[in-house]
Swiss-Prot record:
Residue stretches in coiled coil: none
Protein known as: tRNA uridine(34) hydroxylase
Keywords: Oxidoreductase, tRNA processing
Entry EC number(s): 1.14.-.-
Main function: Catalyzes oxygen-dependent 5-hydroxyuridine (ho5U) modification at position 34 in tRNAs.
One family name in Pfam for this protein: Rhodanese
Family: Belongs to the TrhO family.
Active-site residues, Swiss-Prot/TrEMBL: C177 (cysteine persulfide intermediate)
Gene Ontology MF term list: oxidoreductase activity, acting on paired donors, with incorporation or reduction of molecular oxygen
Length: 247
């Protein structure tokens, strides 16, 4: 029986003075170990999702930690029968998740994490539940009673927040996204604007599904993912009918 492919997603908001200098080092390590996927680098940190053997993806993760001098990394690992990525790319970006808001300090303004085991009970008591993902993702699946901002890109989310200031004012706000990184920025944005009670699902939808198996059926549908699987079911297996056919 062949070894399953590990899919590792990791992000960290850590100051990187010269992110471009990391590109050849990460490409060298990743390609040598037959790792595939995408790693985004910027001065605000890194955000990557890549696949390979369990040993190989963890070696790339350790290289990322070493090069950025950080241990504070949000990590998620699951498995697949084949690579969901076709090659390794390491890219330099202005932001590791593009919101297009200048001078937003994610480490200064932070929403409060809600653990996956507490999420179901928590969202049944909250005033506002916001799905921070894009409309095409929400259409595939979302939590019951969640608000869909109907954005086409994450850069449109700040405008939605401004347009819905009265809806959000003085409310307890619960937010969620696929793997957690967009919620780091969206909750930071709301906190920086003066909203006090802002919370988000730790580890995102993927961690929630792994930990809870959607036992209370508050999650409805599948979870859109940005690789060749396109969507995963409650058990994180590729959702039927979504796998991207390769040419």
């Amino acid at each position: 029986m062949s070894e399953k492919i590990a899919i590792l997603s990791a992000y960290s908001f850590v100051n990187i003075e010269e992110p471009e200098s990391l590109i050849p080092k990460l490409l060298f390590v990743g390609k040598r170990k037959y790792v595939k996927g995408t790693i985004l680098l910027s001065k605000e940190g890194f955000n990557g999702s890549f696949s390979g053997s369990y040993e190989s993806v963890n070696l790339v993760l350790e290289e990322l930690k070493k090069l950025t001098n950080t241990k504070d990394v949000n990590v998620k690992i699951n498995c697949s029968e084949i690579h969901p990525f076709q090659k390794l790319k390491v890219r330099l970006k202005k932001e590791i998740v593009a919101m297009n808001v200048d001078n937003l300090n994610v480490n200064l303004f932070k929403g409060e994490y809600i653990e996956t085991k507490d999420w179901d009970e928590f969202i049944t008591k909250q005033d506002v539940i916001v799905d921070t993902r894009n409309d095409y993702e929400v259409e595939v699946g979302t939590f019951k009673a969640a608000i869909n901002p109907y954005t086409e890109t994450f850069k449109q989310f700040p405008a939605w927040v401004e347009q819905n200031a009265e809806l959000l004012k003085g409310k307890k706000i619960a937010m969620f996204c696929t793997g957690g990184i967009r919620c780091e920025k969206s909750t930071s944005l709301l906190k920086s604007m003066g909203h006090e009670e802002v919370y988000h699902l730790k580890g995102g939808i993927l961690q929630y599904l792994e930990d809870t198996q959607n036992k209370n059926n508050l999650w409805q549908g599948e979870c859109f993912v940005f690789d060749d699987r396109r969507a995963v079911a409650d058990d994180l297996a590729p959702a039927e009918g979504y796998w991207l056919e390769r040419k």
